[in-house]
Amino acid sequence: MDDMSLKKGKEFEERASKFLKKQGYKILARNVRYSFGELDIVARKGKTLVFVEVKGGNPDFPPRMRVDRAKLRRLELAAYKYIKDFSPKFEESRLDVIEVLSNGEINHLKGVGRW
């Protein structure tokens, strides 16, 4: 990934984090990396642990379309690993996608995996 893409990705993640905070989420971690995948944002709201994949781009081709089955599987594995490593005691967990669009719009898609 080139420097420009990394910079944009970080910008999208920052905007998504601010959005989540305004919605009452507490950010627990960002950019949790494992050999098989990365969790962009780990947050909690109440008793729910939320793993968030952030995608940014043009509204003409929704960024969520870049989250395919293989990507979802890697995210699920990373989420399971995070839970195992840090043993948080949450009643629920879920996998979300946040789209940060070039027109300024932010879409929060909740519960996108097989969770």
Swiss-Prot record:
One Pfam family in the UniProt entry: UPF0102
The record's GO molecular-function terms, alphabetically, read:
nucleic acid binding
Tell me the CDD domains matching this sequence.
PoNe_Nuclease (cd20736)
Q: Which family does it belong to?
A: Belongs to the UPF0102 family.
Q: What is this protein called?
A: UPF0102 protein Kole_1919
Q: What is the lineage of its organism?
A: Bacteria, Thermotogati, Thermotogota, Thermotogae, Kosmotogales
